[in-house]
Amino acid sequence: GVGCFENNQSLKEVTLPQGLKTIPNYAFAWDYNLEGDLVIPSTVTEIGCSAFYETGIRSVTIGDGNDEIQIFSNAFSHCANLKWADLSNRVRAIYEEAFGYDPILAWVRIADGNVSLDAIQGFAFCYDQNLEAILLPTKTGEIWYSAFGWCPNLKEVYYASSQENYNSYVRVSRANNDCYFNATLHYNSQGPDEWPSTVFSGWVTIKTNSYWYENDVLQ
């Protein structure tokens, strides 16, 4: 249920079983010692609000499948060690701040499939200061205000289909999405041959706090 493993500092890894349908709100929130590569089974259709908020996971991979999945608000926000996200071919919606304030997140892949990505909501990837590349599926719909706000290193946007389809499907708010519009848009692409390096060294500021990373490890 809600908050089932919330604020559990003894939890260091988790294996989610095939057949699981829902990850509840706050399920693993504030589990700072939860680390490693998180795999979400292909049967999961909802990742609840703040489900993995402020955890130490290194990556997230969602299994491909036929059942659409929704990623709710703050599901993976403030994850200081999250380096990349492979979100499958079945994402219906990414809600507000779902991946916001992830300081070393380097790339995001949303594969092409039969599901329409109805919306990337406001602030979904805000303040992802190391985000360099994202792949969007053909049936991407609305990209809301500030969805990519304060992502100064966003350089490449890959789109799975043609420019004609992009113009037909995709509607991007002009409000605080300059980083998105300044990136290079690649049509008919499944992403780069090699995704950006996830190794990061430097200072990262999250709201009023500053953090030093050495070779992508928070010091």
Describe each region flagged by the PLM.
Residues 125-126, 149, 170-174:
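A structural signal for leucine-rich repeat
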Residues 172-184:
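Short, conserved catalytic or adaptor-binding loops enriched in Gly and charged residues
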Residues 1-4, 24-29, 48-51, 72-75, ...:
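Consensus positions within tandem repeat domains that build extended binding/scaffold surfaces
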Residues 94, 120, 143, 208-215:
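Extracellular/luminal Pro/Thr/Ser-rich low-complexity repeat and linker "mucin-like" segments
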Residues 8, 174-175, 189, 219:
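Amphipathic alpha-helical interaction segments
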Residues 8-22, 32-46, 55-70, 80-93, ...:
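Structural signature of tandem-repeat unit edges
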Residues 197-219:
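Extracytoplasmic/secretory-pathway segments with low complexity and glycosylation-like composition
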